[in-house]
Amino acid sequence: MPDRGGENGASCSVGRWSAEEARAIYNLPFNDLLFRAHGLHRENFDPNRIQLSKLLNIKTGGCPEDCGYCSQSASAENGLKASKLMEIETVLEEARKAKAAGATRYCMGAAWRSPKDRDMPALTHMIESVKAMGLETCMTLGMLDSDKAEKLADAGLDYYNHNIDTSERFYPAVITTRSFEDRLDTLANVRNAGIKVCSGGILGLGEEAEDRIDMLVTLANLPEPPESVPINMLIPMPGTRLAKAAPVDPLEFVRVVALARILMPKSHVRLTAGRTAMSDEMQALCFFAGANSLFMGDTLLTAANPGDDRDSSLLRRLGIQAETEQPA
């Protein structure tokens, strides 16, 4: 295995990971894998600090995409009614609450294939107003062309989330209305506009371990790896094609977190959806393996989230404190 720099094998900006290298790391004995991941985590971050984000659904339901996991897809049979774009003042009031609760980043998500021209003035106003509160901004709005990415960048958007979800091989089994290449094109447009990239995937879609590894290799081998890598555990939502998906083995999930930390040592790795089904012990292992960001609050889009009380209790017991300043 080629040298990646650093005594624990930190990846650098030059050089690329092969699937074979990543697979060999993923298949290490569990303790060896976590030892390596935690060493890299300590080299690049304070292991007792965590970045807190708040996610708000600013436009719910009615998305024309057929993502098999998503309750907001128009193809989901769950009776979810599509909403209009949320009023700007409502978005800002929720941002004030998020900051008061300790969030340093405010993420705004809309169930669209891509934003329309008519929505751009409201979106840029949201970005500018949230930034004026001293919060980092993130949006996830579907696909972006270069023009819309530039407009969001001009408004000061810090991060754009667009997950690749899974491996290129397995992707067509989950989504048919948007190609894997479409997702990579959006990430390129975001990066070229000067916006930081947030991109990760979902475990529990029916994929194999190879798909999880390949997904992370794809992200690590982008011209610049994402600054933020969300790792989701599928929440089977009623009415979706994956409503009866089998649960993910907790230790396999921790392995993916550890591999993400090793392949992308300078990125924030975020525990995202599915934490309500994770034990405190499982989350603690994820933090040890390199996860250092999470979403706070009781809901994530249309799904449940552990809530601030449970999170505060867990972090206090682990001696982990929230980042008080925006990460560089």
Swiss-Prot record:
GO terms assigned for molecular function: 2 iron, 2 sulfur cluster binding; 4 iron, 4 sulfur cluster binding; biotin synthase activity; iron ion binding
Domain called Radical SAM core: residue spans: 48-275
Keyword annotations of the record: 2Fe-2S, 4Fe-4S, Biotin biosynthesis, Iron, Iron-sulfur, Metal-binding, S-adenosyl-L-methionine, Transferase
Residues binding [2Fe-2S] cluster: C107, C138, C198, R270
InterPro entries: Aldolase_TIM, BATS_dom, Biotin_synth/BioAB, Biotin_synthase, Elp3/MiaA/NifB-like_rSAM, rSAM
Sites where the protein binds [4Fe-4S] cluster: C63, C67, C70
EC code: 2.8.1.6
Protein's pathway: Cofactor biosynthesis; biotin biosynthesis; biotin from 7,8-diaminononanoate: step 2/2
GO aspect biological process, one term: biotin biosynthetic process
Reactions catalysed: (4R,5S)-dethiobiotin + (sulfur carrier)-SH + 2 reduced [2Fe-2S]-[ferredoxin] + 2 S-adenosyl-L-methionine = (sulfur carrier)-H + biotin + 2 5'-deoxyadenosine + 2 L-methionine + 2 oxidized [2Fe-2S]-[ferredoxin]
One Pfam family here: BATS
Cofactor: [4Fe-4S] cluster; [2Fe-2S] cluster
Record text on cofactor binding: Binds 1 [4Fe-4S] cluster. The cluster is coordinated with 3 cysteines and an exchangeable S-adenosyl-L-methionine. Binds 1 [2Fe-2S] cluster. The cluster is coordinated with 3 cysteines and 1 arginine.
Similarity comment: Belongs to the radical SAM superfamily. Biotin synthase family.
Function: Catalyzes the conversion of dethiobiotin (DTB) to biotin by the insertion of a sulfur atom into dethiobiotin via a radical-based mechanism.
Subunit structure: Homodimer.
Name of the protein in question: Biotin synthase
Gene symbol of the encoding locus: bioB
